[in-house]
A protein has these predicted regions:
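Tryptophan-paired
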Residues: 1
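Low-complexity, disordered linker/stalk regions enriched in Pro/Thr/Ser/Gly
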Residues: 4-216
Length: 216
């Protein structure tokens, strides 16, 4: 095959068949030397806006995604999501374009771009991201609603491993606790003992920012 960086010459001869069954061949004509240029494919990256990297995968908390396509040279081509579930074109030569993906289901998705630059050199890029719109679970086992306490109270419960639980006691700073690997959490908070009755509000949030409905 042809090798980039080397020079090649194209030779051309004409011929004519004679009535006697012979053949007349012209002198060979040679082209000027042609250097095979190494293809310079575009470096194209795809990335979801507002993504958070969780366990090595970009994650967004919306079912509507905006994917930014950025190239180091002008490109055009086609994109597809999940082997054709959605698809579109980048018809004009460009170095950047935003791709809108609406109505995505929770889970992992792959978007693929296949295109070429001004020199017709091809390029192929893939990008995997995850959609997570669900908040973590939250169950409070202690304290009991309407219970009597003095200066402190211990809040216990269950949530998703790695989530953050926030405990908001009236007139106190909000306390934060990380849920353990087994899903349990426990935190002792100080109460304002000048108040005869007070609310404690508890809610949880995952790494991407999905929050539970507060529990009082």
């Amino acid at each position: 095959g042809l090798v980039s960086g080397k020079q090649y010459v194209v030779g051309l001869k004409g011929y004519k068949n004679t009535s006697s069954g012979g053949q007349i061949v012209s002198a060979e004509t040679l082209s000027s030397p042609v250097t095979m240029v190494e293809p310079k494919k575009a470096d194209v990256t795809l990335k979801a806006q507002n993504a958070v990297n969780i366990d090595g995968t970009d994650t967004i908390k919306s079912s509507n995604a905006v994917i930014d396509l950025v190239s180091d040279m002008n490109v055009s081509g086609e994109w597809s999501l999940d082997s054709g579930e959605m698809s579109g074109t980048v018809s004009e030569k460009t170095m950047s374009q935003s791709i809108n993906l609406d109505g995505l289901e929770d889970g992992t998705h792959i978007i693929t771009f296949k295109g070429e630059n001004d020199s017709k050199d091809g390029t192929l890029s893939e990008y995997m991201f995850t959609v997570d719109t669900l908040p973590p679970r939250l169950q409070i086992s202690s304290p009991n609603n309407g219970g009597f306490f003095e200066d402190t109270v211990t809040v216990k419960g269950i949530s998703d491993s790695g989530a953050k639980v926030y405990i908001d006691a009236e007139n106190q700073e909000i306390q934060e606790v990380t849920v353990g690997d087994d899903g349990s959490f426990e935190k002792t908070v100080t109460l304002d003992n000048s108040m005869a009755y007070q609310n404690i509000v508890v809610y949880a949030a995952d790494e991407i920012g999905n929050e539970t409905v507060p529990v009082t």
